[in-house]
Regions:
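Single-stranded RNA-binding regions, centering on S1/OB-family and related RNA-binding modules
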Residues: 1-297
Length: 297
């Protein structure tokens, strides 16, 4: 049975009366300075809806009673600054539904707001969705982000061909072309959950944000024909192999799609090897070079 997000938020939230009736002074009497600081941040987030930021350290499934007197398994993201476990149920993690595997989010830096405090149980419940709503409102109505702005983005999850980042309260999924001028066969070799990036705003609306990490930098293909004339040789690093082509990266970031010289075979070369390539041609529509591998360093 699908759990209604609004109902879940209400049922997991600690009431103000219950919170104010808790004997925090007695419970916190023997805490260390670090423990006290951790709990004070949790209390403040609950009381004033201030944001907390920590790293997702794993997943946990907890029982959740339903109206039919049955228990349903509720999967939660887990964050922990020091000793207090904070559970974020998956329905309260996203603002919009996504197909992202929750395991891919482990290691990501996320913002959240505390909605429930179990002081005696040494844990708390939070909602990332509330933090996203707050950040989105601030970005649109206070910061007034617009097309062309460069903003900070945090990698939420990364797969071989798609990456999701969080910026200004939006979860934005992008393909390889929006990430790098250099061809990337597997983006997980360059990006990981929790990584901090800069991204350029391509368009923005009340419920959408389009970004490009690639456009923050300079396109290395511009004037590449002057730096790497046809017939010249250059050091390059093999970045991937695909359909008989060997994708190599020059020191300035240009991609060279190569063939091997006749004396070489494919099993002599691996991804990450440094090689000498000879520049053979320029492919403007792909914005890459063609070349031939002449040697291995």
């Amino acid at each position: 049975m699908k759990i209604d997000t609004k109902e879940l938020l209400e049922r997991l939230s600690t009431s103000r009366r219950e919170f104010n009736a808790t004997a925090f002074a007695e419970l916190d009497r023997n805490l260390s300075d670090e423990e006290r600081e951790e709990w004070n941040a949790i209390y403040a987030s609950f009381s004033s809806r201030s944001l907390l930021r920590n790293t997702v350290i794993g997943l946990e499934t907890i029982p959740f009673p339903t109206d039919e007197n049955m228990e349903q398994a509720l999967t939660c993201m887990v964050v922990m600054r020091h000793l207090v476990k904070v559970l974020i149920p998956l329905p309260l993690f996203w603002l919009e539904p996504t197909g992202i595997n929750p395991n891919s989010v482990i290691g990501a830096e996320i913002d959240y707001i505390i909605i429930g405090v179990d002081r005696e149980g040494e844990c708390a419940v939070a909602a990332r969705s509330l933090a996203l709503e707050q950040q989105r409102w601030h970005a649109l109505n206070v910061q007034h982000i617009s097309e062309g702005d460069v903003i900070s983005a945090s990698v939420l999850a990364c797969g071989p061909t798609r990456i999701t980042v969080t910026a200004c309260g939006f979860d934005v999924t992008m393909g390889q072309q929006a990430m790098s001028y250099t061809y990337l066969a597997d983006m997980r070799e360059e990006y990981h959950a929790g990584q901090q990036l800069q991204a350029k705003v391509l368009s923005v609306g009340e419920d959408m944000l389009a970004l490009s990490v690639r456009d923050v930098g300079t396109d290395p293909y511009v004037h590449a024909e002057l730096r790497h004339p046809v017939g010249s040789s250059r050091i390059a690093t093999i970045s991937s192999k695909y359909a008989g082509g060997v994708f190599c990266r020059l020191t300035d970031g240009c991609t060279v799609v190569c063939r091997y010289a006749q004396q070489f075979s494919d099993d002599q070369f691996r991804v990450g090897d440094k090689v000498v390539v000879q520049i053979r041609a320029f492919v403007d529509e792909k914005r890459w070079l063609r070349g031939k591998i002449r040697g291995k360093l």
